[in-house]
Amino acid sequence: MDAAKRLELCKEIQENEIEALKAIFMDDFEELKVRNAWNVTNGHVYCIHLCSRSANSKSIAKLDLCIELGRSYPYVKPVIKLQNGENVLNSQIRFLLDKLDTKAKDLLGEEMIFELASIVQDYLNDWQSDLSSQFASLEEERAVQLKHDRERAEVDLQLRLKREKDALFEEEQTLQNKIQDELQRRSYETPQSSSKKKTNSKETTSLETLPTSIYFDCSISVRDCHDSLVTFNRVLPLYTISHSNLSTLTLVKPESKEISLQDCVFLLRTVRISTPYWSTEDGKREIQELEYELESLKVIRHDLLASIYEYQLERETRGYGWRLYVLQEYSPKFTLFSLLQTVLTLDVETVRAFSNNILEGLAELHRLGISHKSLHLDNVVLFHSGHRTFAKLMDFGFTRTLRDMNASHPFNINSQSITNILPEGLYPPEVSESSFAAASRKTDIWCFGLLVLQMLCGAHVLNKFSSLKLIMTHVIPLLPGSYQDLVRRCLMRDSRKRPSAIDLLSSHVIRLGTAVLPPVEQGTFSKSARPSYGGQQDGIIDLLYRKSVSRYETDFEELEFLGRGGFGEVVKVKNRIDGRFYAVKKLVLLSDDKENSRILREVMTLSRLHHEHVVRYYTAWVETEANDTVTEIISSDSESLSQSLNMAVDFRQSSSLPADKLSSLDIHFEDDYNSSADEEDPEASDISFQYSNTSDKEGSSDKDSSIEEASSVKTQENGLNATLYIQMEYCEKLSLQDIIRDKIPVDEMWRLFRQILEALAYIHSRGMMHRDLKPGNIFLDENRNVKLGDFGLATENENYQDNNDKWKNRQSADEDLTTGVGTALYVAPELLSRRNGVRYDAKVDMYSLGIILFEMCMTFSTSMERIRIIDTIRSPSISFPSTFPFSRASHEFKVIHCLLQHDPTKRPSSQELLESEAIPPKVGEEFIQEGLRLLSNPNTPYYLKLLKVLFGQVPDRHKDFTYDFNLSEESGVLSKVSDRGWDSLLACLVRDHVVKVFRRHGAKERESHILFPKSSQYDKDQASVSLLDKNGTLLQLPYDTVLPYARNVARNAVEEEKTYLISDVFREAKGGGRPKAIKEISFDITTNSDNLDWYDAETIKALDEVLTEIPSLTESCILINHADILSSILDYLQVSKDKRRMATHILGQINQRLTLSQVRNQLRIESLVPSTTLDDLSLFDFRENYEEGASKLRKIFGKEMPQKMRTALNYMERVVKLLRALKISHQLYFMPLCVYNFEFYDGGLMFQAINLAEKSELICAGGRYDKLVRFFDPPLMRTARKKHVVGICFALEKLVFSMLRYIRFHNSKQSSKHSPSPTLKSVGPWAPRRVDVLVTSIGKDSILEKCSLLQELWALNIQADIVLRGASSLEEIVTHYRSEGINWVLVVRQKNTQMEHSVKARNILKNEDDEIRFDEVGMWLLGEINERKRNESMLQSKRILDSAQQDVAKFVDTSQSNLDVQLISLKDVNDRKYKWKHKQNAMNKVYDLVQSAIRESSEDAIALAVDCDSEAMEKLRSTTTLDEESWKRLIESCPASQREYMQRLQKKLVTLAEQDKKRVWICSFRTNEIYLYGLK
């Protein structure tokens, strides 16, 4: 054919095709006039306007197909363009153009425009299904939201009415209470009897309204009567025992099933804070400080401190304000005030016992850096244990804080007037009522002195003598002698001169009672003035002069004299009971209080020390004996004394309460005390007080009124000798002084020095210092190990306290420590200073240690040389002698030089020196600890040597065998054996679908970074896998994919880049062994551009597409938030910066693992959010669309909204607009508490996806992590252009498990239909398949035939595998391999058989067998696979359609209706050009329209799907099958192209009428109109 004829033929073909296209597409076909470069009109450019077709919604996706035909078309491919797309992504257009271009090449030589248009139409219909389901869900969501808003408005109205009603009721109740209060006030002002007043008091107490129960967020742990730990959360009020203007005290019992708790009673203090100030920021800040104080106090447990078990701060349920609950230990006995109200005064021995308890409690508080601040009679409570009664301190610290807070801003109207605790004249000089917050430990000592006065003279004494001058002049001279000195010392005006609690405990009047007291003269407070309980009492001197058995002589055998000191001797003894050897120090107690205090201070110090290098202390006691003349006089009278009275005093650990600790207390409680009895009635208690120590001569007149002067009367004058026995650990008769004279080997010297240093570090950590450290006080045991002893000058380091407790009172800068000094050669220079106010601390021991080390290094020929050289080195210049055996670079020189610095601040502490490199490593058994220290410091010279040895170990085979021991233990859902085979197959499917989405966005795969230096961004409790390389570098495996990529971006120059990564992240195995690997998929966009909102939006769009791609995630939603918004919320909640990491970790579990209530409790338990703002957390617990969520935030913050929150909201608004333009398929919510890895995404947008079908399971998380990138950006490599990264991370395991549950669900539905292979039929393309085809044989093996067939299948790209051994039956093969997703089994016949040229094919899906010729197997399988793909595509389309119709279907009883949809098309139904998908979509659309109306018909119905416009549908309503004229008018009014179509419709209706059908549904799939057409 020549060129002219060819062109003529092409023109004819084009004209015919254009005419056909105009008939098919009608108005949607348009011829365009396009001018070329030479301004000539090209008349062969056509445009077809295509849109998606949907039966139940408008056309959403639209696209114009523009075709430019060349002269040689169809032999030359036309120019194809896609324009004017609506709701179609650019990526989809590019994809479609590739499809059209490929199809056009395949159809060269044929008419192709209709085929190309059909392809575009098909894809538009597919996209329509996705978009229509999205829009439908949005519309339904809007309807649900509107309904929810209406319901919420109704609830709000009801709540508002209820609040108004409650407010009115409360106002009336308040008025009624005021009326009752006024009546009671008037009744008290009128004269009436005391019994009447008591009755009114009871009525007032009962007026307090008690809640039914109080719930504590934190569990409360207490020990029951069996010393078992039991817990509870709720308490039930029993009775209000006290109601003051400040607080209410209520007896409560725990609500618990524990039998041991049934009789337990606790004290609940309730403080109501209702004035407006406490709702302001300043008020909340003060309340928050109170919480910190209570948090520190509730952990204190001591036998002489009443415990604070728990506290809770709640908002008032009505109105504004707070309610504070403090649960405390309760005593069913008296307070000290109640006791003194009953018995007026106490005898001196009882005062001593109670004073000892009070001082031990104060000493413990002061050791913790806490001042009581509110020590008075009501805060000393009495407890009963066995036959003894002892005193405890309660309400320490926080009650004074409450009073001060109330004084500055009253808690409520009634709390404006609070009674002062002390008279104005008796306040400590350093404070007043308004400034008591500045109270220190010395203020507590002042209050203790007043307590002693009240115990000795009665509670009223401070009211009668209301100034210090009156007390000093008229009261103190009448006290017993030693108590005069005690009270005077406590009431020193200069707080620096007051003793500490430890000093007072060491005084003989407290520790020894009246054992060494002289008799005193009778004063004003005489025996006759006291109430008598239990008969006539004997005097103190009578009690002391009775005969007793010596404990020392009874229990010990004295073996050897060890040494003698100024006040006594030390002997070696053998215990007659256990047979062990001990050292006993015997000290004669003199009348000098100061010397006795020094002796007792050593005992007190030893009692609190327990260390391997400190001399162990066991016990101490005092024994007294009289001179012969006195004994003889008293022996006759002593018969009347109680024979059970024992004067031995046991000084054990001060923090415990031994059985015989309070042996001198003579208060006996008879039977059980009824706690509900009236405490003001003396007759209500059965208590007898025996004043066994009362003397007829209790007081002494002191001629000298000076406070500082203490009376002293010698014991010898009264014929009384007192000896203190101290039982200690026995050390061999050897000290460092004995061996230091000889040359000590260097290794031995350092060993001894380290032990001394460890002992010092221990006593310094206990808040004490030795102050008399010298070789003679450093003893050596039989193994030549150090034992530090002789604590005669040791003292409490009153500077020691917890620096972390900011609320605790700091020690006054003017407080003095003891001024005693040790041996002159070893004592620190600051101790020798005579200047007043010179302060020192534990560094004085370090100076002494330096002298000792110097002496250990040197060898002296004479004592004078020793003194001269040590005196020289003690100079400020630290002049070492020329004979010093070590160089200046040696450890010895450096340590001594730093220890002998005259400036204490330049000396190291004991712990610092112990941890420094200056101390040579230990040897022998102690090397392990030293090795750990060296490994932790890479700068030591031994570090690399240790690593070399560490990495040079010989591998252990047993560790190799057990390394993977726990690897098979799965933590996920997979439990069946068959599921485990599915894991990898399904994971590959899921991974491929996710990667397809990422590649659609132009992402390329990047390399993973498997090992990098350990990062500080992870918490210690996170199970990251840490490793150590041979160079000692600490490394880690990836814990996630975010941090390694951020580190890589920071270190490399990166332009705009989209990447994805599929990599393992690792978790440390709990029991050791191989780390657990978790597959993670991430998608990240890196850029230097400033269009951050677009990249954030694109990342979220990619997330949305992944959720759409995986069918198990269709019921998911996307949550967005901004880190700056969450940070502003944490500021609003007053969460401190150091607690935000843990707080955000807990907040991230809201509505996933934990409810809001559980999150609140967790935050409360961890003390992360103050109670004053914890209730405000609910304000931000919402999940709304962006506009509503932003509006809520603006209402909450108002004009005080932080600027960074405003900026973040504006940024989020831009991102949301872009997402709506991108038309994401899933619901987008704004959730202010949405957070995951806050430290990573700080300063940027954060987003998550959660699966609502799986209890809000977190699917993935992501956000912008620019700050993390900057964290890893090396300072020297930073550029002006910032690097921005945003990304998302999926845990592949979660996606696989989600799909697995989805498959199981569909399997369970399909199994009821008895499908032969429900697994594959129900899930379609998501069925995991290892291969499609399995080649096998029956009986004798035919390996060569199988190989030939297998090679042919592989050549056709068919996935196939072989079973090498022949099977016994085909059913055996099918059963064995069905779980692997195989569809076809091919059975190869053996040679020389009748069927050797054919193959038996079993279709497992259909359970059908076919015989296929051997040479046709490949093509047959290709056809079968293509058919399966079409069926799976149909199944997937039907599932999407069913999902969109589920809301309609639930209202229609489809089981009772049989709808037959028949299509009337423009062309013959069997015409191949009218594709099946067109027919199916049209019929499905009509089916949906009929569903909403099918309820009106109870009979089977027929629906006709027609392609008519609205005008034609309207005219159809006026026609009937019996009226031919109406049809003629209808047909004539239609366009020529539609008339034939309408005639065919008429014939169809007549045919149905002849079949006796009554009615038919006529549905237009063009206009979505439906009409029930009557046929009769």
Curated annotation (Swiss-Prot):
Region feature Disordered, mapped onto this chain: 180-204, 673-714
Modification after translation (UniProt): Autophosphorylated.
Active-site positions on this chain: D772 (proton acceptor)
Reactions mediated catalytically: L-seryl-[protein] + ATP = O-phospho-L-seryl-[protein] + ADP + H(+); L-threonyl-[protein] + ATP = O-phospho-L-threonyl-[protein] + ADP + H(+)
Knocked-out gene: effects: Decreases translation of transcription factor fil1. Decreases RNA level and translation of genes involved the response to amino acid starvation.
InterPro entries named in the record: aa-tRNA-synth_II/BPL/LPL, Anticodon-bd_dom_sf, CC_SR_Kinase, Gcn2, HisRS-like_core, HisRS-related_dom, Kinase-like_dom_sf, Prot_kinase_dom
EC number(s) per entry: 2.7.11.1
Keyword flag Transmembrane helix: no
PROSITE patterns to which the protein is assigned, alphabetical: PROTEIN_KINASE_ATP, PROTEIN_KINASE_DOM, PROTEIN_KINASE_ST, RWD
The protein's assembly and partners: Homodimer; homodimerization is important for kinase activation by uncharged tRNAs. Interacts (via N-terminal RWD domain) with gcn1 (via N- and C-terminus); this interaction stimulates gcn2 kinase activity in a gcn20-dependent manner in response to amino acid starvation.
PANTHER family named among the record's database cross-references: EUKARYOTIC TRANSLATION INITIATION FACTOR 2-ALPHA KINASE EIF2-ALPHA KINASE -RELATED
Family under the similarity heading: Belongs to the protein kinase superfamily. Ser/Thr protein kinase family. GCN2 subfamily.
Protein name per the record: eIF-2-alpha kinase GCN2
